[in-house]
Amino acid sequence: RGSXLTILPLRNKIDLFYVG
């Protein structure tokens, strides 16, 4: 999962700090 900042736009989820 993403550790850090997680931005949730209208449809997609973008993890700025994605650490498996």
UniProtKB/Swiss-Prot annotation:
It comes from the Eukaryota. Its main location: secreted. The keyword Oxidoreductase does not apply. GO terms for molecular function: aspartic-type endopeptidase activity. Expressed in chorionic epithelium (trophectoderm). N-glycosylated. GO terms for biological process: proteolysis. It is found in: Secreted, Extracellular space. Belongs to the peptidase A1 family. This is Pregnancy-associated glycoprotein 73B.
